[in-house]
């Protein structure tokens, strides 16, 4: 009978997350995790079906860290919630560049994106309620604001190539104001 594993799945994922945070996701190997735990790589395979299983759990743990970071920031911020979410995203990129890269800059073309639509719908509904926008205008505003916020988040990460600068995003602010004004103009029946 094989000996019981001395490390829990959570401890192994925490080691993989620490490696990601320090050296990037590509540095997460069976050997690196084992070295971090001062153990052999066999402990990983007694708790996980393989490296892909561990890597998926590491991505989930990084996502949970971002969600907790964002929720704490929004709760403690004096800014309106929508702005605070964007600010939290940018600060997370600056404070946790390797986790940010893992979550938001890896190739996700082969991944399931079904949860993304639900997250976006919550924000679009919020914008519709707060700014009296149509779903189409709120979606457009959110996409434009997300592009602006994501570009700023990419820029603030340490080791960013300073030769690449974002375009002036005043157009996004103008578009948001334009959509907001249009939402408050009376329609043909005089309703706002």
Indicate residue ranges for each PLM-predicted region:
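Helix-turn-helix
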Residues: 11, 15, 19-53, 57
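Alpha-helical DNA-contacting segments of helix-turn-helix folds
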Residues: 20, 53-62, 103, 111-119
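Hydrophobic alpha-helical connector segments
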Residues: 57, 71-101, 135, 141, ...
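Amphipathic alpha-helical linker/stalk segments
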Residues: 60-84, 118, 122-129
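Amphipathic alpha-helical segments used for helix-helix packing
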Residues: 90-111, 119, 152-162
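Amphipathic C-terminal alpha-helical segment
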Residues: 102, 146-164, 178-189
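Amphipathic alpha-helical packing segments from all-alpha helical-bundle domains
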Residues: 107-144, 169-181
